[in-house]
């Protein structure tokens, strides 16, 4: 890669991360039409996520969940002045190109939609629009950041109104970061090698089909022209940055199962930079009141008296689901 290209890429990444920082400390709400988008904006959302169905309805409908119709996204973009995000299927570069051309402010490469690629996520550095991606653990987060994600969010278990998986993912990432901070650089390089292993799946599958040993050559490209060693080196640099910062080097939001002001406050108390709310707003009995309350909870997460007050007269939250009852675990999608 020539020097000018490296400089341009770093500049683009800085701009992408800068946009993500603009929504830090706020609430991003899933919406399916212009009316919902306006409710979200009036409640104080920092951005909206345009979908054809909220995650609870996607889960109920089954079948293949895809990018929202262009007309629906445009309708939402025309209705509000705050940033509009939209989801694409994991690995579906064509959907992402369409959204980039449409002018959305950020793309969510999301496990809520049916994955398109069983081996890889999109190489997000090829795009000028910033991406947000989900992560259950530090390995997933570091891989997505290396690929170019400007924002990370927990996966949680979308559409359930159950916060347990989001809590699990926050704890796993935070504890792994504390472990990294106690490790030597040599030990961290070993972690980078482990975190890079999912990129080998396609190469190993092809070699197994061909009756060859499951190993790759030093100069053998395995993902977007990168060799295994180049990927390891890239992940290693991010891990060293995490060791220095004591946190992810990008904005980190909670998502998946946030259904009440208390849920939102819990996520902020655990160190999150903000909150995505999917089904929790428009599957509640009083969406405008719930939306306002969750925004206030994020702003006042460390003030119990305020939280108690804003939790009054907000109606019933969405009906939740026990994780053990789920037929589909969306959080397990992706690598």
Swiss-Prot record:
Classification via CDD domains: pdxS
Binding site for D-ribose 5-phosphate: 30, 159, 257, 278-279
InterPro entries, per the entry: Aldolase_TIM, PdxS/SNZ, PdxS/SNZ_N, RibuloseP-bd_barrel, Thiazole_synthase_ThiG
GO MF term (any one): pyridoxal 5'-phosphate synthase (glutamine hydrolysing) activity
Record EC number: 4.3.3.6
BP term (GO), one: amino acid metabolic process
Catalysed conversion reaction: aldehydo-D-ribose 5-phosphate + D-glyceraldehyde 3-phosphate + L-glutamine = pyridoxal 5'-phosphate + L-glutamate + phosphate + 3 H2O + H(+)
Pathway annotation from the record: Cofactor biosynthesis; pyridoxal 5'-phosphate biosynthesis
Pfam families associated with the record: SOR_SNZ, ThiG
UniProtKB keywords: Lyase, Pyridoxal phosphate, Schiff base
Kinase is among the record's keywords: no
Record's keyword annotation contains ATP-binding: no
Active site per the UniProt annotation: 87
Gene3D superfamilies: Aldolase class I
Residue numbers binding D-glyceraldehyde 3-phosphate: 171
Subunit structure and binding partners: In the presence of PdxT, forms a dodecamer of heterodimers.
Purpose of the protein: Catalyzes the formation of pyridoxal 5'-phosphate from ribose 5-phosphate (RBP), glyceraldehyde 3-phosphate (G3P) and ammonia. The ammonia is provided by the PdxT subunit. Can also use ribulose 5-phosphate and dihydroxyacetone phosphate as substrates, resulting from enzyme-catalyzed isomerization of RBP and G3P, respectively.
Similarity-based family: Belongs to the PdxS/SNZ family.
HAMAP family: PdxS
Descriptive protein name: Pyridoxal 5'-phosphate synthase subunit PdxS
Organism whose genome encodes this protein: Pyrococcus furiosus (strain ATCC 43587 / DSM 3638 / JCM 8422 / Vc1)
């Amino acid at each position: 890669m020539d020097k000018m290209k490296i400089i341009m890429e770093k500049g683009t990444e800085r701009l992408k991360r800068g946009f993500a920082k603009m929504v830090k400390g706020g609430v991003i709400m899933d919406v399916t039409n212009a009316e919902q988008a306006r409710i979200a904006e009036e409640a104080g959302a920092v951005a909206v996520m345009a979908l054809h169905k909220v995650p609870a309805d996607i889960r109920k409908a089954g079948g293949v969940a895809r990018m929202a119709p262009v007309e629906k996204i445009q309708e939402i973009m025309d209705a509000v002045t705050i940033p509009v995000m939209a989801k694409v299927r994991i690995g579906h570069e064509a959907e992402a190109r369409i959204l980039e051309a449409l002018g959305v402010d950020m793309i969510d490469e999301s496990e809520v939609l049916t994955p398109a690629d069983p081996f890889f996520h999109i190489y997000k550095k090829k795009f000028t629009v910033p991406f947000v991606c989900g992560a259950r653990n530090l390995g997933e987060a570091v891989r997505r950041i290396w690929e170019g994600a400007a924002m990370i969010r927990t996966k949680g278990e979308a559409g359930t109104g159950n916060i347990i998986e989001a809590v699990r993912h926050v704890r796993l990432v935070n504890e792994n970061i504390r472990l990294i901070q106690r490790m030597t650089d040599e030990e961290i390089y070993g972690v980078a090698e482990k975190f890079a292993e999912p990129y080998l799946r396609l190469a190993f599958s092809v070699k197994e089909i061909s009756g060859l040993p499951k190993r790759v050559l030093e100069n053998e490209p395995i993902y977007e022209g990168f060799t295994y060693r180049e990927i390891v080196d890239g992940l290693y640099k991010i891990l060293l940055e995490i060791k220095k910062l004591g946190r992810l080097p990008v904005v980190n939001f909670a998502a998946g199962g946030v259904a009440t002001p208390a849920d939102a406050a819990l996520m902020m108390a655990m160190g999150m930079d903000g909150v995505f709310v999917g089904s929790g707003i428009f599957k509640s009995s009083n969406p405008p009141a719930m939306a306002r309350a969750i925004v206030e909870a994020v702003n006042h997460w460390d003030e119990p008296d305020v939280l108690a007050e804003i939790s009054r007269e907000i109606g019933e939250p969405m009906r939740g689901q026990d994780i053990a009852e789920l037929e589909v675990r969306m959080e397990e999608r992706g690598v």
